[in-house]
Curated annotation (Swiss-Prot):
Assembly and oligomerization: Homohexamer.
Keywords: RNA-binding, Stress response
GO MF, one annotated term: RNA binding
Record-linked Pfam families: Hfq
Function of the protein: RNA chaperone that binds small regulatory RNA (sRNAs) and mRNAs to facilitate mRNA translational regulation in response to envelope stress, environmental stress and changes in metabolite concentrations. Also binds with high specificity to tRNAs.
PANTHER family named in the record: RNA-BINDING PROTEIN HFQ
Family listed: Belongs to the Hfq family.
Cystine pairs: none
InterPro entries in the cross-refs: Hfq, LSM_dom_sf, Sm
Domain Sm: 9-68
Protein name from the UniProt record: RNA-binding protein Hfq
Keyword Zinc-finger assigned: no
């Protein structure tokens, strides 16, 4: 795992596992809402009434609907599509 993913992957994985509703703002200003179904290095699958594949390079901000605690650094992160 590259250094750039040391925060991103555990954060997205926590949002996925806890099924936290999120708002995802794209760089063009569009707001998407739903739950993170899965993710990999390049995309996030966002589920609402339909599933959408959102490319990470198009994302500006991910806002959870409630505060989220990241797992401690002692635990290895699980893959996003587990």
């Amino acid at each position: 795992m590259s250094k750039g993913h040391s925060l991103q992957d555990p954060y997205l994985n926590t949002l996925r596992k806890e099924r936290v509703p999120v708002s995802i703002y794209l760089v063009n200003g569009i707001k998407l809402q739903g739950q993170i179904e899965s993710f990999d290095q390049f995309v996030i699958l966002l589920k609402n009434t339909v599933s959408q594949m959102v490319y990470k390079h198009a994302i500006s901000t991910v806002v959870p609907s409630r505060p989220v605690r990241l797992p401690s650094g002692d635990q290895p992160a699980e893959p996003g599509n587990a």
